Regions:
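Beta-strand initiation motifs
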Residues: 50-51, 72-77, 115-120, 157-162, ...
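Disordered, low-complexity "stalk" and linker segments at domain junctions of extracellular
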Residues: 1-106, 110, 116-122
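Beta-sheet-dominated scaffold domains
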Residues: 128-265
Length: 265
């Protein structure tokens, strides 16, 4: 089900019941946009404060006489807190256990497991700085920001924990963040930062000075994972980086890239 509509009728069962005791509920119309609505599901709340199932109705039904007795009400409404995703959200990323993640400004969002339309506000996490990009790795979700990076981990969207990684390196290019499997790489002011679990370091420090790195205009980098290498394009060329092996430069330009897992190209 979707998130519930606002309450559509209030009925004082003691002093304001209609004749015969059965209220007539006027239902909202179907939106004019193509919403692919199959049924309307009616719930009722009584003294317990919990909305319980009353009936399934066809989309075009405009009124319903509610004659269902209290002891015949069905299960509780599961979608009370299933908020729509924030319209500003970007960076949609799949996590294990059917969870999706996205972000806007300094806020990280999570969906309900296997319910990509449900994004409870109560699951959101705030960060000290605006988020630049996110990437799912085997150790958790790497969140790079305009300040320090963070690692977020958890098995369910309502129990995610965030820790700040001990490397004072912001992300200077959102498209530079790449999942490399057990770790992620991203472009910082001083070089490529490798974030592996709770550990993070500038991985290119031994092969490139800060001055050499800055001359490559790291804020223009967009990068991809290919054959275990970090393949990056920037305004001026291309390079492939492999931790422990070094960096190779190529005279190639590209505006975008895509990894085809079927052909491994």
């Amino acid at each position: 089900p979707s998130a519930p509509s606002p309450a559509i009728v209030r009925w004082d069962m003691v002093g304001d019941a209609p004749e015969g005791g059965d209220p007539i509920v006027s239902l909202p119309g179907v939106p004019s946009a193509a919403s692919n609505i199959e049924i309307k599901r009616l719930y009722r709340v009584e003294s317990s404060g919990v909305y319980q199932f009353v009936a399934d109705l066809a989309p075009g039904v405009g009124q319903y006489v509610d004659s269902v007795q209290s002891d015949a009400l069905g299960r509780a409404l599961p979608s009370t807190e299933w908020d729509m995703p924030d319209a500003r959200m970007i960076g949609l990323t799949a996590l294990p256990n059917g969870i999706l993640a996205g972000f806007f400004e300094n806020t990280l969002c999570f969906s309900e497991a296997y319910l990509p339309h449900a994004w409870p506000v109560g699951y959101q996490l705030a960060f000290p700085d605006d988020i630049m990009a996110i990437s799912s790795t085997s150790a958790g979700l790497v969140v790079v920001t305009e300040g320090q990076p963070h690692l977020v981990s958890g098995s369910s969207p309502d129990a995610m924990a965030q820790i700040e990684l001990d490397v004072p390196q912001s992300c200077v290019a959102s498209r530079s963040l790449v999942d490399m499997g057990e770790y992620a790489l991203y472009a910082s002011p001083d070089g490529l930062v490798a974030a592996a679990g709770r550990d993070a370091r500038v991985a290119t420090r031994e092969v490139l000075s800060r001055e050499q790195w800055q001359a490559m205009q790291p804020e223009t980098i967009h990068a991809y994972r290919h054959d275990g290498q970090y393949l990056a394009f920037y305004d001026g060329g291309c390079f492939a980086f492999t931790p422990g092996e070094g960096i190779e430069f190529y005279d190639v330009q590209a505006d975008a890239g895509y990894y085809d897992a079927i052909d491994d190209t």
